[in-house]
């Protein structure tokens, strides 16, 4: 079975928006052996969308469109589908009721908003739990809003429906092992000899949250993947921070709540400017653990808020092991994280170059400070400092709960 993806939106062609939807779609369809035949970007122009649909229906079994489902004049994807199929656009009365509930929270909808719940006559709608416009499916064509969070909310619902309708079964098994603290090339050199089990494809994918070792095979070879995963843990366990949909912040949260009493945590951040705290509080329920974040960017704030000694700052400088250690002393929770560094582009010296970061970790009475020299632009250095802080905390917590 083959599928084609159309990304609808002039903003995708002029660089105003970056596509991430097609990656997600391809990965999900791949699990059922559905091949992506093509991916195309189409402007918000009726003739171009209908022309694209004509091409697609001759070449693939499933046509997926994202974008153009909103209430404005240039949102014409469903209108183009209806025109191509020679069907009327009708209001989905069930979805209209849902839309009214959503708008009631802050304003009443006007007539243009009801455009979001229109569909080609006979189409099936899929409820949008995080936005306004539902996805619609008819005659081998499905349209989703362009917002990634809305697509990810509805795509599993559609896929479940489509799989059942076409009597498909999962053909591909995918296992992701998430690593951090080891470079992609070193990782490959370290583990590539382990991939000897038959008919298993492997690749290394660099993400913001780590480097993935992706193992892919036919569903009947699932046991062979399990054997490789076991070997990976035996060889590189110190760098493994999770599997599949695991994320480091969720794993840390689990570690904080393994005992009879939840552990509390706070952060004192300079160069990361609250990024460590922000990542942690993405986890639902962490309010029982997370107490505060102090962004002490200036020396004055470090002295006043965290009781860092003026003498320490004068002798060693703000970017130093000693200051990272004293920043932790100002945190009164079970666990503390401190960051201080030079994110650039300016401010570096020969002794303290741009990218130099000190990360302090306090767990109960044990304190460790890690020195890192990170590469990249300002945002990359800050992102990597945040991830290194969480990675080092996880490694310490993992040892304590074993």
Swiss-Prot record:
Transmembrane segments: none annotated. It comes from the Bacteria. Pfam families: CinA, MoCF_biosynth. CDD domains: cinA. SMART domains: MoCF_biosynth (SM00852). PANTHER family: NICOTINAMIDE-NUCLEOTIDE AMIDOHYDROLASE PNCC (PTHR13939), NMN AMIDOHYDROLASE-LIKE PROTEIN YFAY (PTHR13939:SF0). Belongs to the CinA family. HAMAP family: CinA_B (MF_00226_B). This is CinA-like protein. It comes from Fusobacterium nucleatum subsp. nucleatum (strain ATCC 25586 / DSM 15643 / BCRC 10681 / CIP 101130 / JCM 8532 / KCTC 2640 / LMG 13131 / VPI 4355).
């Amino acid at each position: 079975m083959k599928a084609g993806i159309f990304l609808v939106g002039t903003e995708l062609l002029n660089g105003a928006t970056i596509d991430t939807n097609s990656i997600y779609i391809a990965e999900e369809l791949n699990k059922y052996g559905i091949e992506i035949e093509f991916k195309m970007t189409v402007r918000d122009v009726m003739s171009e969308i209908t022309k694209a649909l004509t091409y697609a229906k001759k070449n693939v079994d499933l046509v997926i469109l994202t974008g153009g489902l909103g209430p404005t004049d240039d949102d014409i994807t469903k209108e183009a589908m209806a025109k191509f199929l020679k069907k009327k656009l009708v209001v989905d009365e069930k979805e209209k009721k849902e839309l009214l509930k959503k708008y009631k929270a802050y304003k009443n909808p006007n007539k243009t908003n009801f455009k979001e719940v229109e569909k080609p006559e006979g189409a099936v709608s899929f409820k949008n739990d995080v936005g306004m416009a539902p996805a619609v499916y008819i005659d081998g064509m499905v349209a989703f809003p362009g917002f990634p969070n809305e697509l990810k909310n509805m795509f599993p619902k559609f896929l479940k429906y489509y799989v059942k309708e076409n009597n498909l079964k999962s053909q591909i098994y995918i296992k992701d092992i998430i690593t951090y603290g080891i470079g992609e090339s070193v990782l490959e050199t370290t583990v590539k000899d382990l991939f000897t089990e038959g008919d298993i494809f492997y690749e290394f994918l660099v993400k913001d949250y780590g480097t993935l070792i992706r193992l892919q095979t036919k569903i009947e070879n699932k046991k062979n993947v399990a054997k490789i995963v076991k070997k990976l843990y035996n060889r590189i366990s110190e760098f493994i921070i999770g599997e599949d949909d695991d994320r480091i912040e969720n794993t840390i949260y689990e570690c904080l709540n393994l005992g009879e009493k939840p552990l509390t945590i706070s952060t004192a951040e300079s160069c990361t400017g609250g990024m460590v705290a922000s990542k942690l509080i993405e986890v639902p329920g962490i309010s029982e653990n997370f107490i505060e974040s102090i962004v002490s960017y200036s020396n004055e704030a470090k002295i006043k808020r965290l009781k860092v000694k003026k003498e320490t700052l004068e002798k060693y400088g703000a970017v130093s092991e000693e200051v990272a250690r004293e920043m932790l002393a100002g945190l009164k929770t079970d666990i503390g994280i401190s960051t201080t560094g030079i994110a650039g582009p300016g401010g570096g010296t020969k002794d303290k170059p741009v990218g130099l970061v000190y990360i302090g970790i306090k767990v109960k009475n044990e304190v460790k400070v890690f020195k890192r020299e990170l590469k990249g632009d300002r945002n990359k250095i800050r992102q990597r400092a945040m991830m290194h802080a969480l990675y080092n905390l996880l490694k310490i917590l993992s040892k304590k709960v074993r």
